[in-house]
Every structure is written in C-alpha cells, then in structure tokens.
A protein has these predicted regions:
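Soluble catalytic domains of enzymes that build or remodel membrane lipids, polysaccharides, and related
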Residues: 213, 217-489
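Membrane-embedded alpha-helical bundles of multi-pass enzymes
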Residues: 2-218, 421-422, 432-435, 447-452, ...
Length: 514
C-alpha cells in the first residue's frame, strides 16, 4: 500500500469521526457541510481513477467505522457493571461500529454501481442511496436507527418542525443532500449545477420559516387543563440495586420520597423502567402496605416492572409498563415489543450460549417479546387519559410506534444508567424530541439516571429533571394541536420522496450539458 493511499484511507476514518461532532450533545452542525462534501468528492474522484468497485465498499466502510466508533463507544459501558462481561469490552468497542459501518460500505458500493455520468444526477443518486440505506439500517432485523445525521438538528427546533410532515427519514434524506450540496458548486460545469446547490439552501430557509409559523400557531392554540396532575419522576438510583441484593423496600421508599405524594391531590405518578429490583408484577402486592400508607384513592401509579408468565412449562419474562391503583390492583399493562439485542435478549441464543454469552439484564435471562402495543385507557374514578406506552429505546423508531393516533400522551419510561456519564443518555433523549414533533403529541419521559422531561409537540422541553439529578415534574395542561400529516401517513411519505428523487435523477440525466 503506497503512502498516498494510506493517508486517504486514514482520512476517511477521520472524516467519519469529525461527522460525529454534529450529533447530540455537541451538535456542531456545520461540520457536516465539510465532511459530507469531502466524502462525496472523494467518491467522485475515485470513480474517475479506477474501476475496482469492491474498493468503494471499503471506502464507505472506513467512513462509517470512524463515525460509529466515536458516537457509539458508550455501549461498552453497559458491560462494566458485571465482571462476567468485561472481557467483551474490547470486542464491542470495535465490532459494533464495524458491523454498522457495513451499511455505509453498501452506500458507496451501490453508488459506484449506479452512478450516472452527470454531476447533479450523481449527487442525487448518492443522497438517495444514503437515505434508503439508513432507512434499512433502522428497519432490518430489530432495526437500529440510532444517530441518523438528521439528529444534528436536534437543538434547532424550527428546522425540525418539517418532520411533522415528512418524518425523520424524509428530513434525513434532505439533510444528506443539503450537507453534500457544496460539492455541486465545486464540481460545477454550468450555472444550472449552481442552481441545484442554491435550491437546497433556499429550501432549508423555507423549512425554518415554516417552523416559525408552526411554533406561533402552537403557542396561540387553546390550552386544556386536566383536573389532576401527571407527576413524572426522574430518579438517580444506582444500578447496584441489581447486583448487591438491595432491599426493594429501600428503593420503593426512595421513589415515594421523590414522588412526594399528597393524598388530597389527584395525581398519576410515573416511575422509570425496571426501577424495582428483583420484584415481578405478581410479587409487588407483598408491598401493598407501603403503597397504601403513602398513596390514596386519588392516586394511580405507572411503574416500570418485570412480568412473568408460564408458557409450556418454561417461564417467559417481560419488560413491562404497568398501571396500578393505590392498593396495587393491576389495571392495565404493556409488555415491551422492541427488545435490545444482547441487553434484553440474546439473538441466536442456542448458538451463542455455547460460547458463554448471555443477556446483560434480568439476571442473565432473556426477555420475551410482547404481543402488540395497545393504547392504555385510564378511565377510573374520574381519571380520563389515553396513553401510548413506550419502554426505553422503543422511542427511537420513527413511523412504527402506533397505527391509531387516538391517544392523549406518549409515556416513555427508561433506565439510562447502563451508559454511565457518557453521551449515550443525551443521544437517547434526542430521539424523544423528534417523536414528539412527528406525532404531534406531548411526551412524558420518566427516567432513572437520565433526563426526565415533558416535551411538547414542537419538540421543546417544557420541564425537565436534568441528567444526574432526582426530582419530579408535574404535567397538568396541554395545548391542542391538529394531528400531524406524518402521524396519518407515516413513512409512506418517505416512499413518495424516494419516487421524487428517482424522477429528478432521470430528468437531470436527460438534460444535455447539465
């Protein structure tokens, strides 16, 4: 390998690493114009120099390796809590980014196969392939749509408002085009090329204007006040509760203290995911005395707790969100359907168990997948609330959360302590912002060792218990908003954008002297 090629390959990794700076919590958005433009220019340059298409897979893979290595390193922190898993840390630090980088390798590989001769058409093909592959990454197998480049805008809410129409994948496709568009100016053959570049910059300005009007319309909408409070608890209880046989009573008392229940006030309390150690749904009744002492008939609790059921002589475990009254009568429950690979279940269990692998949580027992996600209707004792339950990283899936948008509120419970003081919990939180905008619904997020918050349909955080803190926030009023276009049609809109790009590619390809 000659020195020049070696430098080029290292540069691709560095470009991917720099691109990570655009993601939460750093959000240096402007670096994407530099990195995406250089990556596209590199592929164009190499396409004119040699015809070895297999090399192009390697180019994209290196860019993806640098990108995912720097923004997903925190996954390995989840292996530090148990001595049995520490030997896997060096493997996960490299293997997870290396696997996800395969998708970026496919981007550059398919690009060189399908690349037209004309610059603008090539640019559109690059953007389209990138956008489609990112959709595939978020859908195939269990799907992992983490750190799409659209999250660079996670603190620019006016721009993000357009996701209420075109969704996350639609805006992600646009972002790829926007960040790569300076390459058209650099490679321009005619003024028409420059016009395409200008078009994307004008469009992003239009998105900002739309977002500003959308914000004003929302802020002028009618407020609706509940006659009860929804109290969202954010706790900071150590994960040692799972490993040191911590008495569940002490954890329950801590949560009650944070919740600060007042018996005369009508309140729905929301506690984080899996917060009670070594207690299943059926065992919680043993602590009825503690709940009945501190809560009244004016109270309901939404608790993240594991459930068990016997199926053909074996025990199935579920990660559940359950609704109780103050006497711990179970009113409704949801079992998580999108499980975390290796964290909550072991893929290819029969094979991987032979080499000593097991799931990290639930005392090494894999969770089972719930049947479906139904809206939970709390209609008891003059409480009227319909919630969409989401547990932990189920919040990351765009366009797959609900078929019926007839609910009042998204309740998302999570345990972010597995990722320590890293950027992981902050990236996790950023997904909630886009889901709120897409759905046009408020999100009530209760988290242990993370960020608990009320997020409105603009994606704005109205109240929060910050990272590393304990406390609660009360949600009592909301603004009414019309159902979003995306909530009606979902990712079908992304499909329409794909067809639009294909039409433009063929149109520009027909134009002589592009």
């Amino acid at each position: 390998m000659n020195k020049k090629l070696y430098i080029e390959l290292i540069s691709l990794i560095i470009l991917g690493m720099i691109t990570s700076l655009s993601l939460p919590p750093v959000n240096y958005l402007m670096v994407n114009f530099f990195t995406f433009t250089l990556f596209f220019l590199f592929l164009i340059k190499k396409s004119n120099q040699h015809k070895n298409k297999k090399l192009f897979f390697f180019y994209g893979w290196l860019f993806g390796l640098g990108y995912f290595f720097t923004n997903l390193y925190w996954i390995s922190i989840s292996l530090t809590f148990d001595q049995n898993f520490k030997f896997l840390i060096p493997l996960t630090v490299f293997l997870i980014p290396a696997f996800l980088a395969i998708f970026y390798g496919l981007i550059s590989f398919f690009f060189i196969i399908l690349k037209p001769k004309k610059i603008v058409s090539s640019f559109l093909v690059f953007s389209l392939i990138f956008g489609i592959i990112e959709f595939v990454r978020g859908s195939i197998l269990t799907g992992f749509p983490w750190n799409l480049i659209v999250y660079s805008f996670s603190n620019q809410l006016e721009f993000l408002s357009v996701t209420s129409i075109i969704g996350t994948y639609g805006f992600n496709l646009f972002c790829i085009s926007l960040f790569s568009s300076p390459a058209i100016f650099i490679l321009k053959d005619t003024k028409k090329n420059l016009g395409v570049c200008v078009f994307f910059f004008i469009t992003i300005i239009f998105f900002y204007i739309y977002g500003s009007f959308y914000k004003e319309k929302f802020n002028n909408s009618v407020r609706e006040t509940y006659d009860y409070k929804i109290r969202i608890v954010g706790s900071n209880i150590s994960l040692d509760r799972f490993y040191l046989n911590v008495d569940p009573i002490s954890v329950i008392k801590d949560l009650i203290k944070i919740s600060n229940p007042i018996k005369k006030e009508k309140t729905i309390f929301v506690w984080p995911e899996g917060i009670l150690p070594n207690i299943s749904q059926g065992e919680l009744i043993e602590y009825e005395w503690l709940f009945e002492k501190n809560f009244s008939q004016n109270h309901f609790l939404i608790i993240g707790i594991n459930d068990e059921s016997i199926n053909n002589g074996t025990i199935d475990y579920f990660n559940s969100l359950s609704v109780y009254d103050n006497k711990l009568n179970l009113l409704d429950s949801y079992n998580k359907i999108n499980l975390v690979p290796f964290g909550e279940f072991l893929p290819f269990k029969n094979i991987l168990k032979l080499v000593g692998l097991k799931s990290i949580t639930n005392n090494y027992q894999s969770f089972s997948k719930g049947k479906q996600r139904d809206i939970i209707d709390i209609n008891y004792k003059n409480f009227y609330l319909k919630i969409l339950p989401l547990i932990c990283y189920e919040i990351i899936y765009s366009g797959k959360l609900f078929k019926n948008n007839n609910f009042d509120l998204i309740v998302n419970i999570s345990e972010d302590g597995w990722f320590g003081q890293s950027i992981g919990p902050k990236q996790h939180f950023a997904h909630s912002i886009l889901r709120a905008i897409e759905s046009g619904k408020y999100i009530a997020r209760s988290t242990n060792n993370g960020i608990a918050a009320i997020i409105n349909p603009l994606g704005s955080v109205e109240q929060a218990v910050n990272f590393g803190k304990s406390g609660y926030i009360d949600f009592k009023e909301r603004r009414q908003i019309q159902p979003t276009i995306f909530s009606k049609y979902g990712n079908k809109i992304f499909g329409l954008l794909i067809l639009l790009y294909i039409f433009l590619i063929f149109s520009f390809n027909r134009i002589k002297n592009e």
